[in-house]
């Protein structure tokens, strides 16, 4: 795994969970090339660690407007991709 620096653009999430999100995203990028598979991996890991219902969007070009549970939202960049991870429902 090469040097990676995440740029957190917006977060309503405890710092330890933010770190887990970035590390999980890095692991997903190591394991998968297709963005849908990267998103599925992150979503499943967060469902397992922090209980359902997590939603994850990964890509280079997308807009979003979501409702999320308090303290369960992060939007960041890693390796030229945007990651939107939030819990709702």
From Swiss-Prot:
It is found in: Cytoplasm, Cytoskeleton. Keywords: Cytoplasm, Cytoskeleton, Dynein, Microtubule, Motor protein. Its main location: cytoplasm. Signal peptide: none annotated. One of its GO terms (biological process) is microtubule-based process. InterPro entries: DLC_sf (IPR037177), Dynein_light_1/2_CS (IPR019763), Dynein_light_chain_typ-1/2 (IPR001372). GO terms for molecular function: dynein intermediate chain binding. Gene3D superfamilies: Protein Inhibitor Of Neuronal Nitric Oxide Synthase. GO terms for cellular component: cytoplasm; cytoplasmic dynein complex; microtubule. It comes from the Eukaryota. Acts as a non-catalytic accessory component of a dynein complex. Belongs to the dynein light chain family. This is Probable dynein light chain.
